[in-house]
Design a protein with these regions (language model features):
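Gly/Pro/Ser/Thr-rich low-complexity, intrinsically disordered segments predominantly at protein N-termini
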Residues: 1-189
Length: 189
């Protein structure tokens, strides 16, 4: 019996770029690029979609009335980092008028929205959610709302590192990102 060992070294997987992500089509899936690695998830469930849409509607009404900027919904990707690339797609986002990308922009705008809304699904893991919040804040987001429909709570994260937890009787506040916007959690949960 031979005593020599054979070692096989596997090549590291090639990292994907934001441009390659644009060319990738995976029907009926939610995809993001995290530090060059493609992350594929199942579509969101009904409750997730309803909460996202309720809040997007309220935000859109406010933004249209004030001319503050634009609201975008799920599947809108934002390039938050390069080499390796990170492209995240929030459930709802607000971009202020001053930071709006050119309407002819193809691909993913290289910016973090001013306000990011993430609605948790039952299979979301806390560590992954915190990593996502970190990516948003490092990418330029000023305010991140993480809504948990199951527990009926919201965690609010700010670029200055502070955070707030709201119970189901709490009120979402646009703070200095969307002045004069507020809505009760009961109206969206």
């Amino acid at each position: 019996m031979p005593t020599d060992r054979v070692y096989v070294r596997s090549m590291p997987a090639a990292l994907m770029t934001a441009e390659e992500l644009l060319q990738t089509s995976i029907p009926d899936k939610h995809v993001e690029l995290v530090r060059g690695v493609l992350v594929v998830r199942e579509p969101a469930g009904y409750r997730h979609g309803r909460v996202s849409m309720e809040l997007a509607f309220l935000l859109s009404q406010h933004v249209k009335a004030t001319g503050a900027g634009q609201i975008v919904s799920a599947e809108t990707g934002f390039k938050l980092a390069s080499d390796p690339d990170t492209v995240r797609a929030p459930d709802v986002a607000f971009i202020s008028r001053e930071r709006l990308p050119d309407p002819q922009t193809r691909g993913f705008p290289a910016l973090g929205p001013d306000l990011v809304v993430e609605v948790l699904s039952p299979d979301d893991r806390p560590g992954e959610t915190l990593a996502k919040v970190g990516d948003w804040l490092e990418g330029g987001a000023r305010l991140v709302w993480v809504i948990d429909p199951e527990r009926r709570v919201v965690r609010v994260y700010r670029q200055d590192g502070t955070e707030t937890h709201l119970g189901e009787t709490g009120t979402l506040d646009g703070e200095d990102v969307l002045p004069d916007f507020s809505c009760s959690l009961t109206s969206i949960l």
